[in-house]
Swiss-Prot record:
Residue ranges constituting the EGF-like domain according to the UniProt record: 41-81
Family: Belongs to the orthopoxvirus OPG019 family.
Gene for this chain: OPG019
Glycosylated position list: 34, 95
Source species, domain of life: Viruses
Primary localization: secreted
Role played: Stimulates cellular proliferation (hyperplasia)and mobility around infected cells to promote rapid and efficient spread of infection.
Protein name: Growth factor
Keywords for the protein's UniProt record, in alphabetical order: Disulfide bond, Early protein, EGF-like domain, Glycoprotein, Growth factor, Secreted, Signal
Signal sequence bounds: 1-19
One record GO biological process: epidermal growth factor receptor signaling pathway
Length: 139
């Protein structure tokens, strides 16, 4: 993520506390009166931002020129134009059940191969034990 996005994200968390606070500092000398208003780093856009964000609040950051949206719950996008679907949130999680499906199949195939091997060895040894001993000479 870019640094500007991180700054904006942090700033939107504290926008409510600074949105309405504008501290005015007034200094007076015999000839000049100077009033300085403390402008918050992040503020609501005001009338120029009406309708900019479709489902959220429009904010203006002092350091980053431009309007940005803080989306309401359930919306996303640059202008909060996309609805976050429940199925989309579920699809982000890895599906672990499909990774276990091949395992029983592989185990069954291996057990079948082992059973065939054991059966063939059993038949071979049984056949060799039943053969008559014709070549054997009795003393």
């Amino acid at each position: 993520m870019s640094m500007k996005y991180l700054m904006l994200l942090f700033a939107t968390m504290i926008i409510r506390s600074f949105a309405d606070s504008g501290n005015a500092i007034e200094t007076t000398s015999p000839e000049i009166t100077n009033t300085t208003t403390d402008i918050p780093a992040i503020r609501l856009c005001g009338p120029e931002g009406d309708g900019y964000c479709l489902h959220g609040d429009c904010i203006h950051a002092r350091d980053i020129n431009g309007m940005y949206c803080r989306c309401s719950h359930g919306y996303t996008g640059i202008r909060c134009q996309h609805v976050v679907l429940v199925d989309y949130q579920r699809s982000e999680k890895p599906n672990t059940t499909t990774s276990y499906i091949p395992s029983p199949g592989i185990v069954l195939v291996l057990v079948g191969i082992i059973m065939c091997c054991l059966l063939s060895v059993y038949r071979f040894t049984r056949r060799t034990n039943k053969l008559p001993l014709q070549d054997m000479v009795v003393p």
